Structures are given as structure tokens and as C-alpha cells.
């Protein structure tokens, strides 16, 4: 099968990018011919498909590209005609690439599937968040993004968001896309609440490349007396709340990741000996730290979809203490078993609540988890092979 993967970035920038790179590797391992379509960023990985990548946008292009013609259209059509894909698998494409490519792929005759990494289909600003709170106003009134100036760039950015949402509305996109693949029930429910037909959706949880994991052994049971945060260091990720809680406890917290809050937090907690900021790290660097941690904390203050960090942590046998928001609780079992796991693999707490977070950190440290069972269950549940066979059902 010939499969064309599309994402605006072709480097390890965020969860959507990591997902697509892992998917490319997985599909090639199964003998499929894979092409990629992305923006031409200097950070991109080397690829023979680079000649088809549209150039990065000027500010003027940012206002016109989401609506149709231009380099995206010409280069994508060239790639369709040269590669002749059976399937076009979309990821994070809005604004820079635009949903235009869904229309072009459909008209070409390819099967079109779209993995949803955020709530952009129902919220022009991607997050369904306004002033730190969940917002559904755009579900029924797309002008709300202009009224509240929700997009970067204030009014001009909001106008672009509004016009893009009007042009590529749910009726149009459902006509051009065969399957939307939300990784969480939360994402499915959000899109349906925003007016999409549930018949067009199939929940397909993210996966992990098990070949990059260490073998299960007695070492999986060996944990050290610290806990970890892994991800972007910004407000919506809840890192400020986590540091407030951690400063009042005597357990060591290791923060792995970069972001706009990092300089401020490093300065604020420079005299707090049990909070350590590692900055950005690659998998090979942070994997041993994550594997030996007593837990990974995900203190999100916005509705995360299907966080890869949860899947990575559990696959290493590390329990997750996650905020009870978005799709996070779907991945955590606090007792017994459920659709999420066959063994207890973490706890949840009230998002943004420092006192509840402190309490749950202490309870998670005190709990007797079976780390090896957590890893075994997660590897079986999130393995790339299990994912591949489910995905093929939607490619046919």
C-alpha cells in the first residue's frame, strides 16, 4: 500500500510530530511505501520528499494560505500525481498546510483518514480554553474567537481563525474525510458536541515503539526516591502548580522539558534543593530517569487529549499521577481493572488544586504498585503492532 502522511512539522517538536515519525517507521517496517508532506522548516529531518514541502509562511501568507490556492495546492497536487497514494493520513495540518489537502486527496481518489491531536475541528484556537477555563462558545458561534481575541496576533489572528473555521466547517470536512481517528473518547465526545457525526469517528489510542523500550526484568521493579514531570514547561501544562506543591514536600522532583516558564521557575526555586530542572532531553537521555522514578506527574490545566508521556511512563513501569481532565483519566486505573488497564497504574487529582496534588503525591509514593505488571500491561495495550492492525481496518 502507498501511504502519504501529512503534518505541518517533520521533526520531533511535539506529540503530533513524534506520532507521525513513529507511524512512518511502523508502516515502512510492514512493507508499505510511505511519503510525507510537511512545511519546509530548517529543523526538519532529511527526507527525499523535501522538494514537495511548501516554504515557511510570511505574515501575509499566514492570512491567505488557509483558504486555498498557492504553493500548498500546487506542491501537494504534484506529490499526489507523482506518488499516487492509496491512503492520505492527515495529522496537524491547519493554518500552515490547511484542510485544503483533505479536499485535494479526496478528489484525487485516495482514502482520507485524520488523526486528531487537538480540538481545532471545533475550536479555532485549538484548545477550547479561554482565560484558563474550558470554553465551548465556538461550537455554536464561530465569531466568538474574534469577540474574545482568542488567537495569537489578537484581532488579525482571530479573524484568520474565524474565516478558516467557516470555510472548512464540519459539513465540508466530513464530506472529504473517510475516518476521523481521535486517540481518546474525550476527543470524540468533544467533536460530537461540536456538531460532528459520531459515525465518522473511531477512537484509536496512541502507540509506542516497543523496540525502544528496555526488556522487562527485575530491574523494572527497582525505583528510586524521586518523581518526574516530563513535557513543555508552560502555564497550561500545570508546571507552576506542580512546583508550588513540590516545594512543600520533602520528595525530589525532576522537571524534564523546556518552555516559556522555565527561566522564571528556575529563578523562583533556585534555593529549593529538591526541585531539579533538567531542561530539554532526548528519549535516550530521559528514559533511564523516567524508568527509575516512583511516578510521573501530569498536572495539566487544559484538556490533554491522549498524552504520549503517560503511555511512555506506564510502558516503563512508572505509575502516573494525572490531572482529572480531558483524556488523561482514560489512561489511568486507580484500583482493580478497566478498559484502560488490567492493573492499577496511577492516581488522579483535581486539576489546579495544589492541596489535592500534594496529598496525591504522598499517597502515590505510599502505594505499593506492581511496576513490572504496569509495564507488561502497557506494552501489550499500546504496542505498535496492536495499533497497526487496528489502523489497517480504516485504511482499507
Protein language model annotation of sequence segments:
Residues 366-395:
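A charged, aromatic-enriched C-terminal amphipathic alpha-helix characteristic of glycosyltransferases
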Residues 186, 207:
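Carbohydrate-associated surface elements
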Residues 181, 221-237, 243-250, 254:
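Conserved donor-binding/catalytic core segment of Leloir-type glycosyltransferases
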Residues 333-354, 362-368:
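Conserved acidic donor-binding segment of nucleotide-sugar-dependent glycosyltransferases
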Residues 1-42, 81-83, 108-111, 247:
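N-terminal subdomain of nucleotide-sugar transferases
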Residues 107, 120, 135-180, 189:
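Membrane-proximal helix-turn-helix segments that form the acceptor-binding/catalytic region
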Residues 264-288:
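Nucleotide-activated donor-binding/catalytic signature segment of Leloir-type glycosyltransferases, i.e.
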